[in-house]
Regions:
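Short linear sequence elements within intrinsically disordered, low-complexity coil regions
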Residues: 9-10, 133, 138, 170
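Conserved small/polar residues in nucleotide/adenosyl-binding loops
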Residues: 171-178
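Extended serine/threonine-enriched, polar tracts that run as long, contiguous segments within proteins
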Residues: 79-147
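OB-fold ssDNA-binding interfaces and closely related basic DNA-contact patches used
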Residues: 1-105
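Accessory, usually C-terminal, subdomains that scaffold auxiliary metal cofactors
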Residues: 150-170
Length: 178
């Protein structure tokens, strides 16, 4: 998997939806602007900074086993973007917190497990708490199929390649003054 940060908010000039340069360990104009807003100490400025804060995303290659909404995706390797909750579920499988739990790499073609995404709305927000892993098993007994899946993976490096970041953009929101 790879991880990246982005910003997504509506400003006076329209929507700003871009990956954050902090992903590349570089200064990001929106993050710097948010810091300036926050440091004024004004609650109105802090509210603006909160609305513009960076968001964390993860991306992995996944084989779509079942997709009732879009059956044309079944059998294809897709890039799957997800948030902290699903990442924590993956991490808990790979690095269990308790001694009686066996570590498992869900991405392993022979000893991994399908991840069943179960989405529901809780208090107006999408919730993935009911998602779960199936019993670990080989993806297939057919080496040709395993090789085809392996060769169908997308480049994760491209997701966070420098050309995917618009470093020249600087968003400035009007700041309430004291």
């Amino acid at each position: 998997w790879v991880q990246y940060f982005d910003h997504g908010f509506q400003g006076p000039g329209g929507w700003y939806i871009e990956k954050s340069l902090t992903t590349l360990n570089q200064k990001d104009p929106v993050s710097e602007h948010n810091t300036e807003l926050w440091n004024t100490g004004l609650e109105a400025n802090k509210d603006i900074a909160r609305k513009q804060k960076r968001r964390l995303h993860y991306v992995s290659n996944v084989l779509v086993v079942s997709d009732p909404t879009h059956p044309e995706n079944e059998g294809q390797v897709k890039l799957f973007r997800y948030g902290k909750k699903i990442f924590e579920m993956l991490k808990d499988k790979m690095q269990p917190q308790f001694e009686d739990e066996t570590p498992m790499n869900p991405f392993d073609l022979w000893e991994g497990a399908d991840f069943k995404i179960k989405v529901r709305k809780v208090d107006g927000y999408w919730n993935y708490d009911k998602s779960e892993f199936a019993t670990p098993k080989p993806l297939s007994d057919d080496d040709a199929k395993l090789e085809a899946v392996w060769n169908s993976q997308h480049s994760l490096k491209e997701v966070i390649a420098p050309d995917q970041f618009k470093s020249c953009l600087l968003y400035t929101s009007p700041s309430p003054r004291d």
